[in-house]
A protein has these predicted regions:
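C-terminal hydrophobic structural anchor segments
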Residues: 26-92
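Short, glycine-/Ser/Thr-/acidic-enriched flexible segments
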Residues: 7-10, 35-38, 64-66, 108-111, ...
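A short, structural micro-pattern
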Residues: 24-26, 51-53, 97-99, 109
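Extended hydrophobic packing segments that form well-structured cores
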Residues: 78-123
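A short, polar/charged loop-to-alpha-helix boundary motif
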Residues: 11-21
C-alpha cells in the first residue's frame, strides 16, 4: 500500500492520481522485462505505454489485469477482488529497469536465488 509519494517534477499530479482514485494506492502489476528486449534495444522512447512498458521492468499502481489469473476474463468484479486482484479506475506504469538491475528471489529460509543479473534473466 502506498502511503506517501514524492517527485522531483509533477508531484501534485502524482499525489492527485494516488490519493484521489480508489485502488490507486495499491500495486496492480509487477513485470520483469529483460533489458535486451527489442523495444529496449531500439533506444526509442515511444511515449506510448503499450510500447514503452516492453522496454523495461515496471511496476504499476491501480488496477490489476483480470487476465493475470486463470478464468479472470470471465469473473465479476467481486470475484476478481476475492481472487486478490486490485481494482481501480486507473493503471499507471512506472518503468524501473536497467541493464544494471539485479533481482533475487528469497526463499523462506533466507537463501537467495538469482533471477535477473545485469538486466537479463538468469533462470
Amino acid at each position: 500500500m502506498l502511503f506517501r509519494s514524492t517527485a522531483d517534477q509533477g508531484e501534485k499530479v502524482m499525489k492527485n492520481l494516488v490519493f484521489n482514485n480508489n485502488g490507486a494506492r495499491a500495486l496492480g502489476e509487477c513485470a520483469l522485462v529483460p533489458d535486451p528486449s527489442p523495444i529496449s534495444q531500439s533506444g526509442i522512447t515511444f511515449f506510448n505505454t503499450l510500447f514503452d512498458e516492453n522496454a523495461s521492468n515496471h511496476l504499476a499502481i491501480g488496477a490489476a489485469y483480470a487476465t493475470s489469473v486463470e478464468g479472470g476474463a470471465d469473473m465479476t468484479e467481486e470475484e476478481l477482488k476475492a481472487a486478490g486482484l486490485n481494482r481501480s479506475d486507473v493503471h499507471v506504469d512506472f518503468m524501473i529497469g536497467s541493464n544494471q538491475m539485479n533481482i533475487d528471489g528469497i526463499h523462506h529460509d533466507g537463501s537467495r536465488v538469482p533471477i535477473f543479473r545485469n538486466g537479463d534473466w538468469v533462470i
